[in-house]
Structures are given as C-alpha cells and as structure tokens.
Amino acid sequence: MAPQTFALWLLLVGTLLGQGCCQHWSYGLSPGGKRELDGLSETLGNQIVGGFPHVETPCRVLGCAVESPFPKIYRMKGFLDAVTDRENGPRTYKK
C-alpha cells in the first residue's frame, strides 16, 4: 500500500508544480516570451491611458509631486551607512 500512496503523492505534487511553473499565454504572447508588437501598442496603450484617472492638481501626498520617496529612502540609507562606518570603522565581509 505504501508504494501506491507514494506514487499518488508524487503524481499530485508533480501536477501542482507543473501548473505553478508553466507560462501563461495571454495578450498575444508566443512561446519563448515573444510578443507580436503590431497590436500590442493598440491593446495595452488604451488600457494604460484609460486605467489611470487624470488629476488636474499635482499629487501632494508625501511630496510625490516634487520627488518620489524611493530616492529619499536610498539617500537616507547611504547617510546612515556612512555614519555607522565612521563610528564602527569600515565593514569587513567574509567570503
């Protein structure tokens, strides 16, 4: 009974992994991840433009009208790394 149960589990796991790892073809996607470029701009261009509401006033949440928050985060991280390097000395990395 154990070999039959083990074979059933292998079949089930193989089926689930096969479904999870397979490529989903949509919007003219061909094998190998290539797309037909002729109709792609027409198809996706209308969705992208129509998908975002047009706002007349600039965004004021977290100052995103001036600058995205991500560069600020990376500059702050660089500043904090420089300060900790001054206090603790340069970092040594093990291979």
From Swiss-Prot:
Main location as per UniProt: secreted
Localization terms from the record: Secreted
Keywords: Amidation, Cleavage on pair of basic residues, Hormone, Pyrrolidone carboxylic acid, Secreted, Signal
Signal peptide extent: 1-22
Residues bearing PTM Glycine amide: 32
PROSITE patterns named among the record's database cross-references: GNRH
Modified residues (Pyrrolidone carboxylic acid): 23
Keyword Ribonucleoprotein: no
Keyword Transmembrane in annotation: no
Listed GO CC annotations: extracellular space
MF-aspect GO terms: hormone activity
Cited InterPro entries: GnRH (IPR002012)
Similarity field: Belongs to the GnRH family.
Function comment: Stimulates the secretion of gonadotropins.
Protein name according to UniProt: Progonadoliberin-1
